[in-house]
């Protein structure tokens, strides 16, 4: 693959972080997913549980584009799915690695997005989801590029990597590896499974032809024990290393002491890949994972908030495309975990020590994780919050004042140009909301458990209402934040605020404004660039 191919892949570029149950502070399995795409409207999907007569057919549409791909036989029984978690706490996320372009099959019926949501509707465990998903592509053909899937339940987390076999060839080659319970892992648009233990059937599952097909295509010629799925089907290039693996590195760097050992791989100084999973230096909480989804390499050699590209107000974002040319040389910008083009983001918490309706929480937000608020969505919820739907016909190019996706984008796009000046106001409101939800969780779940002991439907209704209430209150608060920011920072000055209210003087008029001007470093560079043009004569 050339560098340009990797840039194209950034159109649909995502991040998954993983925490095994013995690596988390409360025994949860935890996985995260940011769906990053220019074109993806951030919404919370809901598929109610249902039963179907034998012979019912299901029409399949490509998740990315809405293109009709064909139809498959519907299952007799499907399970409730809200977002990317089902009623049995099974959660599936993904990142696209692309891989060898000649292996795409445009005649397949099952794309990666459909594979996720059909898989969730038909599976009670992660292992069952792997079987359902691989059986589907074997029967109906795999339409998409190479994918890494995170497939999790309250007890196990698996990474499954899959790629097609080429035009008109039904099925896919794939391998699934279980993440050890005491480890963390991640993937971010580059295949991460290298060698795997073909004899460990308990922790490694793979298609029978995963090695032989690579031999047949000329991708591999060694002995089986040396076979690397990633090297065979998604050869490493600069973009895969720097834009994709670097996000995994940032996670490992934060929670292990080995970050410095893996940095040369990210910088292209060695081809020795990072391990698929590592043991963290301390156990991670759900909040730790939420905060990691907001990462921009802060405090590392890849930090982008302090160089010239960060602009006047130290913004840790770079506009698309990531590459640019000056003269005949090509350059790039870093691609952190948190990015402006996210449609939605979640951190899934799955707990084996609680009944399924209570144990599974999808902490869900829309737009950029850095300025999102993660609200609790219980896996038993039978109704998605209206603000998380296509209310008023909202979509990626249709604005609605009642859509959380658009309200959060409205706020974040006010903040991006004046990031260091405005981000603290966002952080304060974000922290207040998330702390409130975190602190309320135990009490809410105790109430739900009491209801569940008497009447499951009452518990489901209670948690559905709580899911909707927290989302709506967050939406209302964020809309108020937006109006507050417009007033406070209007016209490049800052209004004075005390106890959350704009100050007035002794006669009731607005208090005098603060004029922040420009940062010292900018003014020095400004004078350097313009010389004596703006110098005041003596």
Short names for language-model regions:
Residues 313-449:
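Substrate-recognition/cap regions that form aromatic- and gly/pro-loop-enriched pockets
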Residues 12-112, 132-284:
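A contiguous strand-loop segment
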Residues 215-365:
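Glycine-rich, aromatic-lined ligand/substrate-binding cores of catalytic
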Residues 2-7:
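Short, small-residue-biased leader/transition segments that mark boundaries at the very start
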Residues 427-538:
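Histidine-centered catalytic/metal-binding microenvironments
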Residues 116-122:
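Short, well-ordered beta-strand elements within core beta-sheets of diverse protein domains
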